[in-house]
Amino acid sequence: MSAALETRDVGRFPEQVIETIDFLDGTTPERSPFASLVAMPSGNTSPEVFVLGSSPYGALLAAELGLPYTYAHFIGGDAVPILRMYRERFKPSARCDKPYAMMALAAIAAPSDEEAEELTWPVALWRLRLFRGDSSPVPSLAQTQAYPWTPLERSEVAATRRIIAGSPQSIRTAIETKIAEHGADEALIVTIAPDYGTRLRSYELIANALARTREVVAQV
């Protein structure tokens, strides 16, 4: 099914979302080329479907289809007008009877603010290379420190930074502030780090810091 859905035609995206939901719900029309496909393993429930986006397009699609919406804060800029539009245009559906907004946040935690800040630079270098067509893995701290940063590159990093970094307390304050500012129902935390151990430690620190706050979903 993934091969059949693979297309760069943005205009077909709404149709593809509907096809995916039908597939998950077992309600694919007989005339569909996917009618003979069966989701396995099957069960009595269907997974939740969120529309992830950072522009009005995804928000409007989620609102029109009555689906939860996840705003990709680590990509976009000002989420307030987009989430407002989503809530105002939302049409209740069998899957979701009222607007449900999630904030997807890039965050990295360390025992101290200073260490966390240092850990943002490998991610910055990785993104810089990615924009230049280099898809190599996230570099190590040593590789990042050895990289000959130019003033222009440093300014680009500062201008496009979308990551929350700090000690557990700093992270907790920053995430709670983001949720409150946008009236989000939930937060999803994404951590990119030079190695698995650093990434796992970050998730553990964030989870412990947010143990008594609103629901936070951390996916390792």
Locate each region found by the language model:
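Hydrophobic faces of well-ordered beta-strands that scaffold small-molecule active sites
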Residues: 48-52, 67-72, 99-106, 187-190
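Substrate-access "cap/lid" subdomains that shape
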Residues: 31-49, 70
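Glycine-rich, proline-tolerant flexible connector loops at the mouths of alpha/beta enzymes
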Residues: 73-75, 190-198
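A conserved active-site cap/scaffold subdomain adjacent to cofactor or substrate pockets
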Residues: 54-79, 83
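Active-site mouth loops of central-metabolism enzymes
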Residues: 43-53, 159-168
